[in-house]
């Protein structure tokens, strides 16, 4: 008697079916990556717009303080009454510092554009975070010191016999105070920029 053998064919999963399953994982991964990239790109666009606004605020502060000179319409034979920002070292520092802040913001625009084109890149965002933090400190120092001098110009100090001058030099005080306000607006913009960079890096 011949031995009869039975062969059972187990259908193997075709290679085409295996290939059909593989992209599913890739698609899900790409979807997650694209979602994160889209969120970061939105932050980068907002970052760019904030930098434009901060440029206007910083340069306006420097220009306003730099053009705040005022000469009183009356004078004597030997004296001419004039108030100028360069009479006070603090206001001189303010003009220089805010000009530097505005210049940095202009130079940072190309880096901000890179973060828009490459929203998942870490290096440009980290560079902006470090530089923004340093320039924020400079901006805050300039605005705070100028605010103290502006307060003295408005109110004076009886303990040191510093008399207020804003009753005589109204235009000078008005322009210098406006420059200080503009500088603090720039501080707010910088603070938001630092927060944006931190959030974008955290999502990486």
Curated annotation (Swiss-Prot):
Residues 64-92, 147-178 are extracellular. It comes from the Eukaryota. Coiled coil: none annotated. It is a multi-pass membrane protein. Residues 1-42, 114-125, 200-204 are cytoplasmic. GO terms for cellular component: Casparian strip; plasma membrane. Keywords: Cell membrane, Cell wall biogenesis/degradation, Membrane, Transmembrane, Transmembrane helix. GO terms for biological process: cell wall modification; cell-cell junction assembly. NCBIfam families: A_tha_TIGR01569. Regulates membrane-cell wall junctions and localized cell wall deposition. Required for establishment of the Casparian strip membrane domain (CSD) and the subsequent formation of Casparian strips, a cell wall modification of the root endodermis that determines an apoplastic barrier between the intraorganismal apoplasm and the extraorganismal apoplasm and prevents lateral diffusion. Belongs to the Casparian strip membrane proteins (CASP) family. Homodimer and heterodimers. This is Casparian strip membrane protein 2. It comes from Arabidopsis lyrata subsp. lyrata (Lyre-leaved rock-cress).
């Amino acid at each position: 008697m011949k031995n009869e053998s039975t062969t059972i064919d187990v259908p193997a999963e075709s290679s085409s079916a295996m290939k059909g399953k593989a992209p599913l994982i890739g698609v899900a991964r790409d979807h997650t990556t694209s979602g994160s990239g889209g969120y970061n790109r939105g932050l980068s666009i907002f970052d760019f717009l904030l930098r434009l606004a901060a440029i206007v605020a910083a340069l306006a502060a420097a220009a306003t303080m730099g053009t705040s000179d005022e000469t009183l319409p009356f004078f004597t034979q030997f004296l001419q009454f004039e108030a100028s920002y360069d009479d006070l070292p603090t206001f001189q520092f303010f003009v220089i510092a805010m000009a530097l802040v505005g210049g940095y913001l202009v130079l940072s625009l190309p880096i901000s554009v890179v973060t828009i084109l490459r929203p998942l890149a870490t290096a440009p965002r980290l560079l902006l975070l470090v530089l923004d933090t340093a320039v924020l400190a400079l901006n805050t120092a300039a605005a705070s010191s100028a605010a103290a001098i502006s307060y003295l110009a408005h109110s004076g100090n009886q303990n040191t016999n510093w008399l207020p001058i804003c009753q005589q030099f109204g235009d000078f005080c008005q322009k210098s105070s406006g420059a200080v306000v503009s500088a603090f607006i720039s501080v707010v913009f910088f603070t938001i920029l630092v927060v944006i960079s931190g959030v974008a890096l955290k999502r990486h």
